[in-house]
């Protein structure tokens, strides 16, 4: 049994993306603090300045950036989870099916449940493919938070084959062969 993981360059790319996402999250937190908690009194604390702004009313110039920063504060951890899941992804073809493991995730996909392979990013340097399955694989994840995060990243009836995976073409070929997919079925699942 061979296990397929991200290549060293794929891991480096994932780390750079995680650092970028963390910087965006810190920027959003800093901007939200500056937007909502500015005070004319330099010695005022964060909550005191925020309370003063609420008492006098927030302007549109404060509300709109604050809402955007709140969206970034919520969305960035979801993006981080997706990158972490990609960074830890391991695919192991076995006689029983394809095993996928990552942080807190262990999925077993029987070969007869694979219905197709869809290319999600056709024009990218390194394409992103999705294995389409007939069942919801995420129901195998016990932790409800990890299950929800996985569904947000991948969807419930597919398993992503990430770009940057070492020998990904060999893995895709083995998946097609073991699941009985023909090139016609793979092409149909791309539509």
Predicted regions and their residues:
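N-terminal membrane-targeting/pre-transmembrane regions
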Residues: 1-65, 184-191
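Conserved beta-hairpin
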Residues: 72-117
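Short regulatory "switch" loops immediately downstream of catalytic or recognition motifs
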Residues: 29-42, 120-121, 133-142
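Juxtamembrane/interfacial segments around transmembrane helices
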Residues: 59-75, 115-126
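Generic detection of short hydrophobic beta-strand segments and adjacent strand-loop junctions
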Residues: 2-6, 109, 157-162
